[in-house]
Amino acid sequence: MTDPESTAIDSVAAMATDHTEAPAHPLHKVLSFVRRSGRLDDRLQRAWDNYAGTYLLDIAAGNLLDVREGVTLDRALVESAWGNDNPLIVEIGTGQGENVVAAAAAHPETNFLALEVYDPGVAHTLLLAGKQGLTNIRVAQVNAPELFKVTAPGTAAEVWTFFPDPWPKKKHHKRRIVQEAMAGDIHRALAADGVWRIATDIEDYALHVHEVMDGLDGWKNLGSVTVSLPLEHVGKGNADLAADMPHADFTESERFEGRVLTNFEKKGLAAGRVIHDFTYQAVALH
């Protein structure tokens, strides 16, 4: 990949080693997920038992999804947990782990951190990584916004957020992972010229991404594809109304070549949904 919107994983910039003090966690957090049952079938339980000790990053606060007090994700932690100082790519919402494990297998020179809150997804990611004997991937079962609040500047080369929970009800849009505050924390966490890659198959979420990111200081949209989107949001079950709304052109990216076609994405395509890809590069704040 040689075009700017498909920055090659192989050539990610070197990261800084600055440390920042972890801010106090708010008493009332807006979560981007709903805690569901963590029951595992026998196969996934065996995977957890066999591979958690190898791949699961011990940064959670007990059985909670909070980040343990005093934890800072920085280059020192990367070197300790991965055993090297290679560039780090963080995937938010790993799901079943298909994409991040495939990326880790294809790029042994890069470290990968998979963030997932649901037990079955964590276990399946452990299973895929363990079966291949990968050494460059770790998994953390924590709330991603909290982790990025305690991530030191320049720690990550890239951040990936593929097919996040769309939270279709308008009253729940504040729970969407793409928010100004999250963008600010990711901007700080990225190395110079690092990128945040986002993908969604929900048109209303694509509009949300543009509203949050396109005018935000410190970010450059590297896209080259023009798409037409409605200028108003629709609520859950009202997606058909979007066709009659005023539309405008927006700039998005070609499909990221480093993202494998997961079962989730296949289902979206089979349902006739359009995939929206975004590549935002962190640039100097004005």
Curated annotation (Swiss-Prot):
Substrate binds at K169, D201, T262, N263, F264, E265. Gene3D superfamilies: Vaccinia Virus protein VP39. The active site is at D165. GO terms for cellular component: tRNA methyltransferase complex. PANTHER family: 3-DEOXY-D-MANNO-OCTULOSONIC-ACID TRANSFERASE/TRNA GUANINE-N 7 - -METHYLTRANSFERASE (PTHR23417), PENTACOTRIPEPTIDE-REPEAT REGION OF PRORP DOMAIN-CONTAINING PROTEIN (PTHR23417:SF14). The keyword Methyltransferase applies. S-adenosyl-L-methionine binds at E91, E116, N143, D165. Belongs to the class I-like SAM-binding methyltransferase superfamily. TrmB family. It catalyses: guanosine(46) in tRNA + S-adenosyl-L-methionine = N(7)-methylguanosine(46) in tRNA + S-adenosyl-L-homocysteine. NCBIfam families: tRNA (guanosine(46)-N7)-methyltransferase TrmB (TIGR00091). The gene is trmB. Pathway: tRNA modification; N(7)-methylguanine-tRNA biosynthesis. This is tRNA (guanine-N(7)-)-methyltransferase. One of its GO terms (molecular function) is tRNA (guanine(46)-N7)-methyltransferase activity. Its EC number is 2.1.1.33. Catalyzes the formation of N(7)-methylguanine at position 46 (m7G46) in tRNA. InterPro entries: SAM-dependent_MTases_sf (IPR029063), tRNA_(Gua-N-7)_MeTrfase_Trmb (IPR003358), tRNA_methyltr_TrmB_bact (IPR055361). Keywords: Methyltransferase, S-adenosyl-L-methionine, Transferase, tRNA processing. It comes from Bifidobacterium longum subsp. infantis (strain ATCC 15697 / DSM 20088 / JCM 1222 / NCTC 11817 / S12).
